Amino acid sequence: EFGHALHGMFSNVKYPRFAGTSVPRDFVEYPSQVNEMWALWPEVLQNYAKHYQTGAAIPAELLAKVTAADNFNQGYKTTEYLASALLDQRWHQLTPAQIPTDVLAFEKAALADAGVDFAPAPPRYRTTYFSHAFAGGYSAGYYAYLWSEKLDADTVEWFKENGGLTRKNG
């Protein structure tokens, strides 16, 4: 959420209504997620993750554990997000006459049709409590989280190809 706050604070636009979290859903999660990503970069983490009494930088072995924990189970997390994004799309493609009464059967069929009906990796959010898709402004736009991860990866590659985190690179 800190990335959303930064996005809002640093927006310098003619029409504030179209700044911060009021940008298109395809982009809205990028500032938030890219800032979360930077927070765990070793070069960044060493600037703020210091011992509260001595000021010593985070030890390399602890940094390795933090990185390993962040990378752990990424496939599972991606599958959860993907299944939720697919359900979101399927619900929002229905006409009023097609809305089913059996929500669980609809979910099962929708996930099977998409090839992601794998019980050990269920959707992150089930329809009955999926507030992003029905009340959170993400109607048919939950995929924005996955798209933001792609944009994050592109950002990382750009920085790696252009000399890393430098003042010149922003």
Spans of features found by a protein language model:
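Cation-handling catalytic/transport regions enriched in His/Asp/Glu
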Residues: 1-170
